[in-house]
């Protein structure tokens, strides 16, 4: 008889937390509810995570690692400025769409009433993404000798705001309004405007 694979309890707890965030929008997740979902006692939860804040930090670590590692791939593999920007924004939107519960953490919705440090961490993720966008836009000037009529920092902020807005709509609609819906058409318009500037 084959032995069943050992469950990584820590990962299982985080998966259950993400699922609960997806299936219970607008509701506060308590450790008692999470323990029941995982099928363990609250004490067992605390053996793996010293606090609920640490559980959310585990999800934030997953978000940061997933996004930044893929952004680095985009930066290494793609050299065209507009394509890089498109892929980076698309990455954010697809990630949120594929991980609805986690998108509530990214958006900050699930962190209301939690430790301020958690909201700061998600803010730092968006700051890192914005820094990458600024770098991409500034490199256009270096590579092509022609920049934009508007400061790259302002443009990077605008592009990030588009993605953040789509994620916020997704969360607000209880995951009905997909962040990637109409993105191709929207990107075409945005790209035209950027290239005209």
Curated annotation (Swiss-Prot):
Q: Could you name the Gene Ontology cellular component terms for this entry? A: bacterial nucleoid; cytoplasm
Keyword Nucleotidyltransferase set for record: no
InterPro entries, per the entry: Homeodomain-like_sf, HTH-type_Tx_Regulator, HTH_TetR, NO_SlmA, SlmA-like_C
The disulfide bridges present are none
Alphabetically list the UniProt keywords.
Cell cycle, Cell division, Cytoplasm, DNA-binding
Compartment(s): Cytoplasm, Nucleoid
Q: What are the DNA-binding region positions?
A: 30-49
UniProt domain HTH tetR-type: residue ranges: 7-67
Example GO molecular function term? sequence-specific DNA binding
Q: Name one GO biological process term.
A: cell division
Return the SUPFAM superfamilies for the record: Homeodomain-like
Supply the Pfam families for this chain. SlmA-like_C (PF22276), TetR_N (PF00440)
Q: Which PANTHER family match?
A: ACREF/ENVCD OPERON REPRESSOR-RELATED, ACREF_ENVCD OPERON REPRESSOR-RELATED
Summary of the function given for this chain in its UniProt record: Required for nucleoid occlusion (NO) phenomenon, which prevents Z-ring formation and cell division over the nucleoid. Acts as a DNA-associated cell division inhibitor that binds simultaneously chromosomal DNA and FtsZ, and disrupts the assembly of FtsZ polymers. SlmA-DNA-binding sequences (SBS) are dispersed on non-Ter regions of the chromosome, preventing FtsZ polymerization at these regions.
Q: Which family does it belong to?
A: Belongs to the nucleoid occlusion factor SlmA family.
Please describe the quaternary structure of this protein: Homodimer. Interacts with FtsZ.
Q: What is this protein called?
A: Nucleoid occlusion factor SlmA
Could you tell me which species this protein originates from?
Shewanella loihica (strain ATCC BAA-1088 / PV-4)
Give the encoding gene's name.
Answer: slmA
């Amino acid at each position: 008889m084959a032995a069943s694979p050992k469950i990584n309890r820590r990962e299982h707890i985080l998966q259950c937390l993400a699922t609960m965030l997806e299936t219970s929008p607008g509701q506060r997740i308590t450790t008692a509810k999470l323990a029941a979902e995982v099928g363990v006692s609250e004490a067992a939860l605390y053996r793996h995570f010293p606090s609920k804040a640490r559980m959310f930090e585990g999800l934030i670590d997953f978000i940061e690692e997933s996004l930044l590692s893929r952004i680095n791939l985009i930066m290494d593999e793609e050299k065209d400025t507009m394509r890089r920007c498109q892929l980076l924004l698309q990455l954010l939107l697809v990630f949120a769409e594929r991980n609805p519960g986690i998108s509530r953490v990214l958006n900050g919705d699930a962190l209301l009433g939690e430790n301020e440090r958690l909201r700061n961490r998600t803010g730092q993720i968006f700051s890192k993404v914005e820094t990458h966008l600024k770098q991409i836009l500034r490199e256009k000037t270096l590579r092509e000798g022609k920049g934009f009529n508007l400061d790259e920092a302002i443009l990077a902020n605008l592009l990030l705001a588009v993605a953040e807005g789509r994620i916020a709509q997704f969360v607000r609609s209880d995951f009905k309004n997909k962040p990637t819906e109409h993105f191709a058409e929207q990107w075409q318009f945005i790209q035209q405007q950027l290239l005209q500037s």
